[in-house]
Curated annotation (Swiss-Prot):
Listed PROSITE patterns: TYR_PHOSPHATASE_PTP
Catalytic reactions of this protein: O-phospho-L-tyrosyl-[protein] + H2O = L-tyrosyl-[protein] + phosphate
Designated gene of the protein: STY-9
EC class of the enzyme, as a word: hydrolase
Assigned protein family: Belongs to the protein-tyrosine phosphatase family.
A Pfam family of this chain: Y_phosphatase
Lineage: Eukaryota, Metazoa, Chordata, Tunicata, Ascidiacea
GO molecular function, a single term: protein tyrosine phosphatase activity
Limits of the Tyrosine-protein phosphatase domain: 1-111
Amino-acid positions noted as binding substrate in the UniProt annotation, renumbered to this chain: D81
Name this protein carries in UniProt: Tyrosine-protein phosphatase 9
EC number(s) given by UniProt: 3.1.3.48
Family annotation (PANTHER family): PROTEIN-TYROSINE-PHOSPHATASE, RECEPTOR-TYPE TYROSINE-PROTEIN PHOSPHATASE
Amino acid sequence: WQMIWQEKSPVVVMVTNVVELGKRKCHKYWPDESAQYGSIKVSQTHIEDLCDYTIRTFVIQQFDGYDVREVKQFHFTAWPDHGVPTRPTNILSFIRRVKSYETPGQGPTTV
């Protein structure tokens, strides 16, 4: 979250599931409600579960500051444990949705 804050990244993209075939593949780095990560407070304010992906909205702020930022996490949940998605339309729809939140002049998208 420190990197997200430092780089002013408004979009985070995740294309792996936390657990695949019963094995942990990725650390769940986001809170379900609110948590402190070093000097950054992260609060989840909204979650939208869709067929192939989830969009989570977070508000982040420095522990001692007044600057508040919104961060959207796009989590593609339909990637199979092995191989690639059977239909490219699923991932293409996901990419279009991610790009719809990107605007010129903002920080980078974090993957």
